[in-house]
Amino acid sequence: MAYPGHPGAGGGYYPGGYGGAPGGPAFPGQTQDPLYGYFAAVAGQDGQIDADELQRCLTQSGIAGGYKPFNLETCRLMVSMLDRDMSGTMGFNEFKELWAVLNGWRQHFISFDSDRSGTVDPQELQKALTTMGFRLSPQTVNSVAKRYSTSGKITFDDYIACCVKLRALTDSFRRRDSGQQGVVNFSYDDFIQCVMTV
């Protein structure tokens, strides 16, 4: 079974991790990664950022464009999506991965915001999710749309929160679906951990 954002699936807005030295030049004469300046401006001495720092970093970088800056809860979701060691923080390589994903999702949002209102409606969300490779029932899409819309409109921030949660839950499901059959068995505790850490 193909999963959205993974090899064999349509869409492909979820690039993999990045190797190499965080931010700084690896060899004399090599230039510093331009994203490192945004990251280093808010990172502590441990070289990690938490959700508060990520929110400041993304706001200062202007990645949201003309849209409202990301709220703290959306930033918490972003950190948890990439927090593989469950530390509540992300390093520079995870930040670079997030940056690439956010840019892809932003372009995707813009392409579905046909009236340039800064929002998408539930039907546009359904089309967007389908083009990203998510094969969800109409009932599930309706539930997702209700969860992330206000007065029938989904803002950029809520769209990103929705994408982050869908990716994180799909990744968690995929890790447990070793036979790639689209079906897994969860213990209650495992289910709660899976859902609450997203």
Swiss-Prot record:
InterPro entries: EF-hand-dom_pair, EF_Hand_1_Ca_BS, EF_hand_dom. One of its GO terms (biological process) is negative regulation of heart rate. Ca(2+) 1 binds at D83, D85, S87, T89, E94. One of its GO terms (molecular function) is protein sequestering activity. Keywords: Calcium, Cytoplasm, Membrane, Metal-binding, Phosphoprotein, Repeat, Sarcoplasmic reticulum. It is found in: Cytoplasm; Sarcoplasmic reticulum membrane. SMART domains: EFh. The keyword Cell membrane does not apply. Its main location: cytoplasm. The modification Phosphoserine is found at S178. GO terms for cellular component: chromaffin granule membrane; cytosol; extracellular exosome; nucleoplasm; plasma membrane; sarcoplasmic reticulum membrane; vesicle; Z disc. It is a peripheral membrane protein. Detected in cardiac myocytes. Ca(2+) 2 binds at D113, D115, S117, T119, E124. Residues 45-64, 70-98, 100-135, 151-169 form the EF-hand domain. The keyword Calcium applies. Pfam families: EF-hand_7, EF-hand_8. Calcium-binding protein that modulates excitation-contraction coupling in the heart. Contributes to calcium homeostasis in the heart sarcoplasmic reticulum. Modulates the activity of RYR2 calcium channels. This protein has been shown to bind calcium with high affinity. Homodimer. Interacts with GCA, RYR2 and ANXA7. PANTHER family: CALPAIN, SMALL SUBUNIT 1 A-RELATED, SORCIN. This is Sorcin. It comes from Mus musculus (Mouse). The lineage of its organism: Eukaryota, Metazoa, Chordata, Craniata, Vertebrata. The gene is Sri.
